[in-house]
């Protein structure tokens, strides 16, 4: 499954997390832990927000990864699907709602 994480960092947490982030190597930043693959991550540094898309079969593994960042920021996590998966789900919804 794919998951979309949206984060927001409070102003008082911004510099501490920024210092943590810039001290990490690219390999450390790319490591989401066993069973979690980072598809992409985008930052809005002016607004102190961003998004990440990860893929994993185990929500617990995703929760562990997100949990390491929770002391610094609020994170909303939602399961997401790609176009083909959404089309298949949409076909099923339409079929289920035929009268």
Outline where the language-model segments fall:
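Conserved short beta-strand edge segments in small beta-sheet-based binding/regulatory domains
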Residues: 72-83
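A common structural microfeature
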Residues: 49-51, 74
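Mid-chain, well-packed structural core segment of small domains
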Residues: 54-67
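Short, intrinsically disordered, mixed-charge
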Residues: 64-71, 95
